[in-house]
Amino acid sequence: MSITLSDSAAARVNAFLANRGKGFGLRLGVRTSGCSGMAYVLEFVDEPAAEDTVFEDKGVKVVIDGKSLQFLDGTQLDFVKEGLNEGFKFTNPNVKDECGCGESFNV
């Protein structure tokens, strides 16, 4: 099982953590949402819980809860700029279907 980050995603997460002034790493998870069933959740974490799994890639610790891990295994997190917009992009090999707006997915 693994979660990987592109160079641009790692740089962006490290910049956010530096601006925040503290933090263990980035929590990546899923929640029920949208028309396709699930949506990604990103937040900073100061201390992982006992049931969390921690991955490290390019110096960034990525924390995933046990319920989300099965849906996120193999995911690559990227940070992209498209025109005037920028944000994190997920490449998840488990996704079977996405909603038209791109906000939610199903595995």
Swiss-Prot record:
Q: Does the keyword Iron belong to this entry?
A: yes
Lineage, top-rank taxon, reads: Bacteria
Q: Which keywords label this protein?
A: Iron, Metal-binding
Q: Which cofactor does it need?
A: Fe cation
Cite the PROSITE patterns for this sequence: HESB
**Co-factor remark:** Binds 2 iron ions per dimer. The dimer may bind additional iron ions.
What does UniProt give as GO cellular component?
Answer: cytosol
Q: Which Gene3D superfamilies match?
A: HesB-like domain (2.60.300.12)
| Description of how the protein assembles with itself and partners | Homodimer; may form tetramers and higher multimers.
Question: To which protein family does this belong?
Answer: Belongs to the HesB/IscA family.
Q: What does this protein do?
A: Is able to transfer iron-sulfur clusters to apo-ferredoxin. Multiple cycles of [2Fe2S] cluster formation and transfer are observed, suggesting that IscA acts catalytically. Recruits intracellular free iron so as to provide iron for the assembly of transient iron-sulfur cluster in IscU in the presence of IscS, L-cysteine and the thioredoxin reductase system TrxA/TrxB.
Q: What is this protein called?
A: Iron-binding protein IscA
State the encoding gene: iscA
